[in-house]
Amino acid sequence: MKILITNLGTTVDNIASSSILKRLKRRMETTNITWCVKNKADKNIFRYNKSIDKVISLEELMILEDTFDLLINLDPFLPHKICNKVKIVDTLGFGFNEEVNSFESVIKGDKQMKGMNIFQMYYNLAGMTWKGEGYDIGYYPRSKSKKTRAGVAVANANLRNYLTDEINLDSMKLWHIPFKKNIFKKMDEINKCSKIVTDDMLTLHLALSLRKYVYFLRINETNTKIEFFGNGEIYEVPKKVFE
């Protein structure tokens, strides 16, 4: 069975939605999966993913001549006329299933869905029920983890003093996680630590994919419920920190 999955969202959107690959591969072992991202640079996200047979950009999809048994559209911004460039037998997701169109405002950031995590949302879009599956990135870090090291990836300067005053890290050595544009180099840095403190959603998801314990410093409400898989907690940052 040939499946085309489209997600033109952010790196976080693609990493989280990769979870559906686990179920698709289990249900249909002979499945051939093509995943479409927005830009050619985004294709790197799935560089090591063996569950995907081919990764293409939106530009490449526009000129693609192929036939797919199923299209799973995970992005409300996908121009539907683009899909007409290829032959599709069956469809799921945005634009094809009215029951899931309410998720559009969640992905756009206009609405919150506190009772549902991001995995449940993507599984619903793909016509499945989430049963605890995690991420499917396919990369295994080259670095070694140290139990005595806590990684800090905090972009907001006001939070740096807050985290040392409010979060008990059991006298662990603080390790600054440097900014890395390449997500795999970022994962190598994250993997050096056993616990992670961050206010960044990408760092949060990458750390959870590596089964790290995460302290997430939440400044604003998130659009979906954060699923820690038992490995983390949220610290609601009070407004006085920024006064």
Give each language-model segment a name.
Residues 1-243:
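Catalytic machinery of carbohydrate-active enzymes
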